[in-house]
Amino acid sequence: MPNMSLKKNEMPSQAPDVRNKNFLEVALGYTEEQALDEAQRCLHCKNKPCVAGCPVGIHIPDFIAKVAEGDFEGAYQIITQQSSLPAVCGRVCPQETQCEQKCVRGIKGEPVGIGRLERFVADWHNKNVCEAPRKPTPNGHKVAVIGSGPSGLTCAGDLAKKGYAVTVFEALHTAGGVLVYGIPEFRLPKDIVQKEIDGLKALGVDVQTNMVIGRVLSIDELLEQGYEAVFIGSGAGLPRFMNIPGENLKGVYSANEFLTRVNLMKAYQPGSDTPIEHAKRVAVVGGGNVAMDAARCAKRLGAEEVFIVYRRSEKELPARAEEVEHAKEEGIVFHLLNNPTQILGDENGNVKGMECIRMELGEPDASGRRRPVEVPGSEFTLDVDCVIMAIGTSPNPLIKSTTEGLETQKWGGIIVNEETGLTSREGVYAGGDAVTGAATVILAMGAGKTAATAIDQYIQSKA
């Protein structure tokens, strides 16, 4: 009998007044009993709308059926037919706008907790199964993947499963891309990411760190070395600023730098080589998940007050509703319909405040959201000693500048065939944030999966 409860099983989590002082994971995950109960809520619809809502096409009702039977490893095997990063996706994928949005149970009540079940299954496997996956039979072909973020790891995993010798070239000293430098420990523990990468290595994927493609080696040199195709999944790590007065003051960070120092360099630990000055009042400019991450990190680093400053209303916030809710629970203050006009400094060049102007919403712009318009005479000053800019990122131009014939958008995104990921260069594919600009982990994974299929077809057609 299906569980006809209108509500999901609640996810156990740390209390807000405890978690905003530590970097331990906020959500604690389902117990076996909760997972079994939640799985019984699935109606196993014949047309499976949830699958259509998943960018990587996980067979969702099938894995949930296995959970309901108590066959958690069987569920894991179904998920990993389509996804190389289930423990990651179960934590950071915006299921509420994808698979769960399509769930029929959501018509009346809450949808099935698909993401929570995916996380449970992946965590159960990691805790209970020690057997390494079998290496596929080598097919004699090799592929280079640039970047070890979600698109690169997905592309590498899918190709490795087909027998390709895959080498991943990562610019940083640690593999994982945005999963390790961009997403905080309390949302995505780094040991979870490492386990996913270890699983890919067990399939035969070779991960080389401290390899900046475009400097150490070029794409043309990789092709000359015998790689039959190259996938560019180098992300979008170049921060954007507002170009307002005061952005060069001490105490102004890009969210990219701030989060990298915290997440990858462990700036919150005593003796860190890349510390962050502890601020009392922090303003984070932006309204996406990155802004929420930066604000919540600042709170954990000891800031007395942390503000989100966003030029539209709460309805237009691009961040996940769950992340906004968590930020509010942890004491983050939202200054909505406000926009910075300049950052103020003291005589020593340190941030002492941020001047803002109030906004109101006008007609919709090209994004479909109502355009924010300044309210004349509404200027005010926010008393802060640190400002973090979280208003987006762009791809690094290094690969473009060292790869002849690689076409890009004016803003730097690589131009690709959307159905294959093929760039303007034969045998060179791209996906993820390097193509779209900053987007979600699961969309980057979908692009990596699409490119892996196209790369396989391309190489096999030449064999």
Please place each PLM-identified region on the residue numbering.
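Ferredoxin-type iron-sulfur electron-transfer modules in oxidoreductases and energy-metabolism complexes
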Residues: 19-37, 59-91, 108-135, 262-263, ...
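Local cysteine-cluster metal-coordination motifs and their immediate loop/turn environment
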Residues: 40-62, 84-107
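Glycine-rich dinucleotide-binding loop and its adjacent helix/turn
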Residues: 121-137, 195-215, 239-301, 409-419, ...
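N-terminal Rossmann-like FAD-binding beta1-loop-alpha1 element of flavoenzymes
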Residues: 141-167, 291-299
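Feature captures the FAD/FMN-dependent oxidoreductase FAD-binding
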Residues: 142-146, 194-244, 342-351, 355, ...
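Rossmann-like dinucleotide-binding cores of NAD(P)H-dependent redox enzymes
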Residues: 168, 172-207, 295-342, 463
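FAD-site-proximal beta/loop scaffold in flavoenzymes
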Residues: 248-279, 364-438
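A conserved FAD-binding loop/helix module that cradles the flavin
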Residues: 434-462
